[in-house]
């Protein structure tokens, strides 16, 4: 417990919360060759490796993910949502924050329907999350 005189000398510091997507919180100045702190909702990146991994204990599947080098130079592991994808090495993708609960170390999602990541085909519901266009009506 702090005394009154200790608190007068130095007040209590408020807790600062850490960001859940640290790679989106800075950019890279190419001319000065140093990082600059500013947050972005998404960042562009290039796929280095596209592969699968198995989830944590009670679940069983082959989840698709990509290792992505972002425009600020950092490398992140990003999940590819939806059924089927056309991503391969050197594909340019848009990466947003958001972790995958049963994949350890995956803190980012690839945005479907942006850049080289095509939208999910034959999707009727929840289309905006998977970059699908409105299907044409048959007469």
UniProtKB/Swiss-Prot annotation:
Residues 8-18 have a biased composition (Basic residues). Transmembrane segments: none annotated. Keywords: Ribonucleoprotein, Ribosomal protein, RNA-binding, rRNA-binding, tRNA-binding. GO terms for molecular function: rRNA binding; structural constituent of ribosome; tRNA binding. SUPFAM superfamilies: Nucleic acid-binding proteins. Residues 1-21 are annotated as: Disordered. It holds the Pfam family Ribosom_S12_S23. The keyword Chloroplast does not apply. The keyword Transferase does not apply. InterPro entries: NA-bd_OB-fold, Ribosomal_uS12, Ribosomal_uS12_bac. PROSITE patterns: RIBOSOMAL_S12 (PS00055). One of its GO terms (cellular component) is small ribosomal subunit. One of its GO terms (biological process) is translation. Belongs to the universal ribosomal protein uS12 family. HAMAP family: Ribosomal_uS12_B. PANTHER family: 30S RIBOSOMAL PROTEIN S12 FAMILY MEMBER (PTHR11652). With S4 and S5 plays an important role in translational accuracy. Interacts with and stabilizes bases of the 16S rRNA that are involved in tRNA selection in the A site and with the mRNA backbone. Located at the interface of the 30S and 50S subunits, it traverses the body of the 30S subunit contacting proteins on the other side and probably holding the rRNA structure together. The combined cluster of proteins S8, S12 and S17 appears to hold together the shoulder and platform of the 30S subunit. Part of the 30S ribosomal subunit. Contacts proteins S8 and S17. May interact with IF1 in the 30S initiation complex. This is Small ribosomal subunit protein uS12.
